[in-house]
């Protein structure tokens, strides 16, 4: 009983710490957070009205993946169990999100469009915070519509409503937490470790090939903690992250366990994806050629997104006064993220969209270069420029 009580107290303390940490994530004043959040919401709604086929602007959404997610979500609402009664190879979270959308708007994709807006606004707001830390508020303000333009008008965005699109804010937030830990000598809060592990789990249970960026950021964070605080720091960080991951997994263990579908879930999502879905042709040389081919297609078809991402990551490796950790802070997560995206041998145009999480790196670098010119603009000019970009 004592052990049980101690465990409950630990979990309660962890949730309280996570809540406190979540309130201070943006490091923005309440007024600025509200204003920038509203701007991000308006920009996201405007751009997705034209760029997502889930929008009311389109009479029909003919993209197969979106229809699969939505149909599976409605099936779950009707009592069918994913992987046991319905078959598809994505993770359970994406179907659960679409079940919520179907609960709100069962007849069309309006609920999905609203979901996309919320996730896009969160991504844009996080990008604002990242650029502000690197280049100041002026550049950060302009980065909101520019980021939306680069992401949602690119070829890799396709018709919208992809796992890659929904994963963007979670990928970026974990990356930002890792970069913030470089600036502080204090141990990472338990709440942040729980939150990062939870976000990693959310992406894992949507599409595990998108976890490369987060996985590398979390590993680097553990290694940095080990360097600063020894083995105790490493295992403290690792334990917090694993507990957060467990919290993201627990709902699915309960759901599939109660429905007698644990084996169906794990076989379909993990085994089938790892050994049946990905291409097994050729050897390492063939796979390397396919990865290079896929990377080139991303660069050539989506230059407005791909070129800034690559330029920003490369630029992040240079600069006076940077430590070795800071020089690899963006690079290694990008490389592992790209490996996860391209290594399968089969690459669809929307796969590299997950790498758009690195766009704030470019706008932060560019904003720092143009800082003096941006400082010369009047305050009234920024809303006008932002509106014009929209």
Task: Describe the function of each predicted region.
Residues 212, 338-340, 344-379:
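Hydrophobic/aromatic-rich transmembrane helices and adjacent perimembrane loops
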Residues 114-134, 142, 149, 173:
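Transmembrane-helix motifs of polytopic, lipid-linked glycan transferases
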Residues 12, 21, 213-246, 317-324, ...:
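Perimembrane helix-loop-helix junctions
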Residues 92, 96, 105-125, 157, ...:
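Loop-to-helix entry region of an early transmembrane alpha helix in multi-pass inner-membrane enzymes
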Residues 125, 297-327, 331, 335, ...:
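Hydrophobic, aromatic-rich transmembrane alpha-helices
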Residues 95, 109, 123, 145-168, ...:
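Aromatic- and kink-enriched transmembrane "portal" helix at the membrane-lumen/periplasm boundary
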Residues 189-210, 214-219, 243, 247, ...:
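Membrane-interface alpha helices of multi-pass inner-membrane proteins
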Residues 166-185, 192, 200, 221-223, ...:
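Specific aromatic-rich, kink-prone transmembrane helix
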């Amino acid at each position: 009983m004592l052990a049980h009580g101690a465990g409950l107290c630990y979990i309660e303390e962890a949730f309280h710490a996570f809540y406190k940490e979540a309130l201070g994530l943006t490091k923005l004043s309440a007024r600025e957070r509200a204003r920038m959040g509203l701007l991000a919401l308006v920009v996201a709604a405007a751009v997705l009205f034209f760029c997502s086929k889930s929008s009311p602007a389109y009479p029909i959404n003919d993209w197969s993946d979106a229809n699969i997610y939505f149909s599976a979500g409605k099936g779950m609402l009707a009592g069918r169990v994913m992987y046991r009664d319905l078959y598809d190879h994505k993770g359970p979270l994406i179907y659960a999100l679409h079940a919520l959308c179907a609960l709100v708007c069962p007849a069309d994709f309006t609920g999905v469009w609203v979901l996309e807006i919320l996730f896009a606004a969160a991504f844009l707001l996080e990008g604002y915070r990242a650029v502000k830390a690197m280049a100041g508020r002026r550049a950060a303000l302009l980065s909101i519509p520019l980021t939306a333009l680069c992401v949602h008008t690119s070829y890799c965005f396709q018709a919208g409503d992809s796992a890659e699109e929904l994963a963007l804010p979670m990928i970026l937030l974990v990356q930002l937490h890792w970069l913030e830990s470089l600036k502080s000598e204090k141990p990472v809060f338990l709440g942040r470790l729980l939150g990062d592990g939870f976000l990693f789990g959310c992406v894992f249970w949507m599409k595990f090939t998108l976890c490369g960026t987060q996985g590398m950021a979390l590993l680097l964070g553990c290694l940095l903690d080990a360097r600063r605080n020894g083995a105790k720091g490493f295992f403290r960080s690792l334990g917090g992250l694993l507990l957060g991951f467990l919290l993201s997994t627990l709902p699915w263990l309960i759901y599939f366990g109660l429905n007698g579908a644990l084996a169906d879930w794990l076989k379909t999502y993990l085994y089938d994806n790892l050994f049946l879905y990905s291409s097994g042709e050729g050897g390492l040389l063939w796979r390397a050629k396919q990865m290079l081919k896929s990377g080139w297609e991303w660069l050539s078809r989506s230059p407005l997104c791909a070129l800034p991402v690559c330029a920003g990551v490369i630029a992040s490796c240079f600069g006076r006064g940077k430590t070795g950790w800071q020089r690899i802070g963006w690079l290694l997560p990008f490389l592992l993220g790209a490996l996860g995206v391209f290594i399968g041998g089969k690459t669809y145009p929307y796969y590299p969209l997950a790498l758009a999480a690195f766009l704030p790196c470019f706008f932060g670098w560019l904003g720092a270069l143009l800082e003096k010119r941006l400082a010369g603009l009047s305050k009234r000019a920024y809303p006008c420029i932002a509106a014009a970009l929209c």
